[in-house]
Amino acid sequence: MDMDMGAMVGNVVPEIVLLVGGVVVLLFALFAPRRWQSGAAAIAASAAVLSAVLVTRRLVVTEQMLTFTDSYAIDHLTNWAVLFVLVATVAVIALSVAWFRQDPRHGEYYTLLLFSALGAIVLAGASDLIQLVLGLLLSSVTGYVLTAYHRRSRSSSEAGIKYFLLGALPNTGMLIGVAYLFGLAGASTYPDLGDALGPTSPALAVGAALVLVGLAFKLGAVPVHAWVPDVAQGAPAPVAAFVTAAPKVGGLIALARFVAVLPPDAIGWRPVVAILAAATMTLGNLAALWQDDLRRLLGWSAVSQTGYGLMAVVALQRSDLAVTSLLFFLAAYVLGNVAAFGVVTALRGRTDRADYQGLGRTRPLLAAVLAIGFLSFIGIPPLAGFPAKLLLFGAAIEAGYTWLAVLAVVNTVISVFYYARFLAPMYFTDPDGEGRPALLSRWASAATIACGIGVVAVGIAAEPLMRDFATALLLPG
């Protein structure tokens, strides 16, 4: 038994490093003098980088399996998800250093960031209803605090309260749904759940629907999406970058694992998810058309991107491209989203469309990064969003949802208009005369540019990445 426990612990060393790193940062923040508080960022970044190195090794040398009595999946899907979340975490730490420099006691912020990342990772690997709830709550509770972290900012506090209040009902409903399913199956692990769930019943339908709503909230999908634009606009900009990216990674993979164990003939989950995808991408794109604030536009863009990601879930078990398209979409989205919010962070205080007039002349590198992020969201080659969109459309068509792929193409065309409303003034309008906009810090600019380069690199390296993503299993299915 001791050897078995040792082996199981060894399987999750990257997650343990993140947990220990969060505790160390918290202790440092409690006892270190105020002038040393920024050192918490270095500790947090070191923990995230070490965890990323370890998970890369796990991706190469460890077989895909379930561990901890089938409650946690160590497959390539989890490993890639961990890498995506950690890339976002390291980038957001770099964005946060100067943003919170004036806060005399901000070391615990990095603890919350690491714990929130851990929550998203647990969500991605959860193969048990209890693990699913644990990941959801850890990611959500830390997200509420991070969103409202600027205590003296009315917009930050308001966004945090809205995030909490709008999440209370879906999260509570998910707990009830988990209780329903546990009562029906007499087990909480997904392998046992799949074996025990029989013919459809009202309780099974209600339980599955409540869990679906809880995960939809985490993703920012219709009809529980209203928090996303408010958080994107009101939270500290580095937090907005993180909250609109990392939980989406964990939430989409958690949803994929959950629906894969539901009885395929007893529960009509596929058309429900397809309708959610259609409604989410359409509402997100239409709402973004009228936005003049860049942060709010990115919030609605995040909603629409969730709709595209749900297409991969719809295609599960019907298309060989489903898992590959899901991973490629997440890679493209995380890099593009953090890059776009990185520009907002580097140009602190400039969020109105008029503020970006002539940015291509005054800050050409940052303007290029924002353009790369937007063009990737649209799906312009050779950026990462192009192969991601192709894979998603192909998966939906193979799964028999051609209408959803056509609607996604229409929505992609719609998105061109609101992205162009920001891109055109950056390059075809003279600066507003206020001079060159000041940068928050070199760290923020460097992280932003690195993410922009990542968007290009992933698009260029699409073929080898697709081969690697194709080896990922969706355990326990």
Where are these regions (language model features)?
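Alpha-helical transmembrane segments of multi-pass membrane proteins predominantly involved
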Residues: 1-477
